[in-house]
Amino acid sequence: MIFFMFNMNINSPVRFVKETNRAKSPTRQSPGAAGYDLYSAYDYTIPPGERQLIKTDISMSMPKFCYGRIAPRSGLSLKGIDIGGGVIDEDYRGSIGVILINNGKCTFNVNTGDRIAQLIYQRIYYPELEEVQSLDSTDRGDQGFGSTGLR
C-alpha cells in the first residue's frame, strides 16, 4: 500500500545530460535487468588496495521519491573490484562519479567506455524522526552481527 502514497508516474522518463562527447548513455543489458550500466568516460589505473573516482560525465535528475543506488557489477566483483559510496540523492544534479575500490592483487585498468557499475532506481521514504528514552523490546533484542546465523 505504500506505493500509492507516492504520487509518481512510473512511466515518466528520467532526464539525463551527457556533459561531454566522452559520455555514454546508461543502458540496460536485458529487459529484466534491475540496473542501468554506467560507463567510464576516461582511462584509469587502480593499483591493488587503492580506490579511484571514475567519472561518467553524466548528470541526471532522479524521479520524485527515488534515489539512485550505485551497485557493483558482478563481473567486476569477481575480479575484486568493489564500489564505495553509492547514493545519488533525489535533489542532486551534478556529475555522477563512481568510486571503484581494487581489493584484488593485481592492478586494474579502466578504459574509456568500460561498464563500471550499475545504477538502480529505488523508492525512498522520508519518515519523521522522534527521539525517545527507550525502544519497545523484541525477542532478538540487541543481538546483531551474525546472531541469527548458523551456530
Curated annotation (Swiss-Prot):
Keywords per UniProt: Early protein, Hydrolase, Magnesium, Metal-binding, Nucleotide metabolism
Lineage: superkingdom: Viruses
Gene: OPG046
Top class in the EC scheme: hydrolase
Secretion signal, residue range per the UniProt entry: none
GO-annotated biological processes: dUMP biosynthetic process; dUTP catabolic process
Reaction catalysed by this enzyme: dUTP + H2O = dUMP + diphosphate + H(+)
Disulfide bonds: none
Protein source organism: Monkeypox virus
UniProt-recorded name of the protein: Deoxyuridine 5'-triphosphate nucleotidohydrolase
Pfam families noted in UniProt: dUTPase
Binding-site positions, Mg(2+): R28
Induction context: Expressed in the early phase of the viral replicative cycle.
